[in-house]
Amino acid sequence: MAAYKLVLIRHGESTWNLENRFSCWYDADLSPAGHEEAKRGGQALRDAGYEFDICLTSVQKRVIRTLWTVLDAIDQMWLPVVRTWRLNERHYGGLTGLNKAETAAKHGEAQVKIWRRSYDVPPPPMEPDHPFYSNISKDRRYADLTEDQLPSYESPKDTIARALPFWNEEIVPQIKEGKRVLIAAHGNSLQGIAKHVEGLSEEAIMELNLPTGIPIVYELDKNLKPIKPMQFLGDEETVCKAIEAVAAQGKAKK
């Protein structure tokens, strides 16, 4: 029997997801479809009777709005919310804002897959002349970050490395106190949590496609190890289509 339950949810489709662009730390909002995904995710949690004690999320609006929508659906908008840059999306550096399919057509799908799916290979850095450099690096929500903490690019390994301290120092104690925890975050930061919780290999985690807007449930033992595979709260067809859509990103259009 599970000692704890942990629920994760990836934000709904953003405006830049809709345009198939590398979103990174750019603060894209939810698209209309993404808002509907978040509503359906919240309804799935409501239908399953989930209640929470604390929520944790990033400082990016597409996730914050997803969380708001979920909490509205389950009528728990009063819950405390902790926001942290450590749960932000991976920083895609110089690729930020580029269309993934066009980038694949220009550089080849193999190169884009290396940038997107290699565990420890970072993309090109975001240079000061990048059109979104000031938009991100000068954003006051990051004013307290040190020069070492504020990235110009990240590999998945880097993203996991900055998310894990928050997991160990903030999330784990909440779970062990018996708090019912909901984490709303991004594909790469949630991959990091999944890798750590499940003990996945570097290769396995890079093939894990987490769907947008669909709650993911872990049942954990007293050592916070899963007693069964992650469970998606949604009908099988919807979940499969959402996973396939994520997997198809980064491919050149035929």
From Swiss-Prot:
- A GO cellular component entry from the record: extracellular exosome
**Phosphoprotein among keywords:** yes
Q: Which residues carry this modification: Phosphotyrosine?
A: Y26
Query: Has keyword RNA-binding?
Result: no
Q: Where is this site: Transition state stabilizer?
A: H186
Residue positions binding substrate: 10-17, 23-24, 62, 89-92, 100, 116-117, 187-188
Q: Which residues form the active site?
A: H11, E89
Q: Report the residues modified as N6-succinyllysine.
A: K251
GO annotation, biological process:
glycolytic process; positive regulation of flagellated sperm motility
What is the enzyme's class at the highest EC level? isomerase
User: Keywords assigned by UniProt?
Assistant: Acetylation, Glycolysis, Hydrolase, Isomerase, Phosphoprotein
Q: What else is known?
A: This is the product of a processed gene created by retroposition from mRNA of an expressed gene. This gene seems to be expressed.
Which NCBIfam families does the UniProt entry name for this protein? Answer: pgm_1 (TIGR01258), PRK14115.1 (NF010713)
- From the Swiss-Prot or TrEMBL record, give the protein name: Probable phosphoglycerate mutase 4
- Origin organism of this chain? Homo sapiens
